[in-house]
């Protein structure tokens, strides 16, 4: 124990000697005015540094020394930062309008409107951002054009004009002019059927009159009634193919119409004869039997 106390006293004496030496050196510097240390002047706008150290307990920087400086707290002069005087009394305010800058283009200008040279003088000049459509377009002009969607068929990309015309691409609305002679003039279906049935019935009536006059003695009156009723039924129940033939015949030339009408009549007569052949042999009249 005595040894430890002696060591502590020696350390205190050494520390006191170091402090005594440092105090003497400071007095020497003060006595020599030529070798006085020149301290740096503090910067304008900054406080004077009165405390500085290194922070060694920062885990974020792996305990590397980080300098820390603290400045004396003095009233800051904020007059250099921005002026505290009064602002402008009458600031300029630009005109404010809810309309856009291009909205005035839709109004009719005061100056006279002039159309390009290539257009006719009768055409009214347009004004505005987008040219306006003239509402005076007649309905007859619209009827002469047929609007449809274009589709390209058998397109060959190996040709030299690879890209087709822009108006003929897929899905483009194209207007084709309808020529006056190309419009089909199709008669109504009722007229075709009436003409076909009327011509057939007239010729059939002539043939039946001749046949009846020649075979009046061979056929009984009961069979004639049955044949007349069956003829009426067959006229009403004509097949669809015969109707189509008659409709197509009316659209062709007059010479072909006559030929098709004759063929149609012959076909109807043959069908009637095959359907209405008498199962029993013809009954002879009593005059010839006697």
From Swiss-Prot:
Its main location: other. Residues 128-160 are annotated as: Mn 1. It comes from the Eukaryota. Residues 213-246 are annotated as: Mn 2. Residues 76-112, 197-228 are annotated as: Disordered. Keywords: Cell projection. It is found in: Cell projection, Cilium. One of its GO terms (cellular component) is cilium. This is Ciliary microtubule inner protein 6. It comes from Bos taurus.
């Amino acid at each position: 124990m005595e040894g430890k106390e002696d060591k502590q006293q020696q350390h205190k004496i050494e520390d006191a000697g170091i402090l005594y030496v440092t105090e003497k050196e400071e007095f020497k510097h003060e006595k020599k005015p030529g070798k006085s240390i020149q301290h740096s002047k503090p910067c304008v706008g900054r406080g004077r540094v009165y405390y500085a150290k290194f922070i060694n307990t920062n885990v974020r920087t792996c305990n590397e020394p980080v300098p820390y400086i603290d400045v004396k707290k003095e009233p800051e002069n904020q007059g250099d930062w921005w002026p505290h005087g009064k602002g402008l009394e009458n600031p300029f305010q630009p005109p404010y309008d809810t309309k856009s800058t291009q909205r005035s283009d839709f109004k009719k200008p005061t100056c006279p409107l002039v159309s390009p040279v290539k257009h006719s003088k009768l055409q009214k000049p347009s004004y505005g951002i987008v040219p306006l459509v003239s509402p005076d377009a007649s309905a007859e002009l619209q009827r002469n054009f047929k609007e449809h969607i274009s589709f390209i068929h058998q397109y060959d990309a190996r040709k030299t004009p690879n890209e087709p015309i822009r108006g003929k691409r897929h899905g483009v609305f194209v207007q084709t002019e309808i020529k006056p002679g190309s419009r089909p003039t199709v008669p109504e279906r009722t007229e075709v059927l009436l003409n076909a049935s009327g011509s057939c019935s007239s010729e059939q009536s002539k043939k039946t009159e001749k046949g009846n006059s020649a075979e009046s003695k061979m056929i009984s009156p009961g069979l004639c009634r049955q044949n007349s009723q069956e003829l009426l039924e067959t006229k009403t129940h004509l097949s669809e193919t015969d109707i189509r033939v008659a409709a197509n015949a009316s659209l062709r030339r007059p010479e072909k119409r006559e030929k098709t009408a004759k063929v149609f009549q012959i076909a109807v007569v043959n069908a009637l004869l095959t359907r209405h052949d008498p199962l029993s042999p013809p009954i002879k009249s009593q005059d010839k039997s006697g």
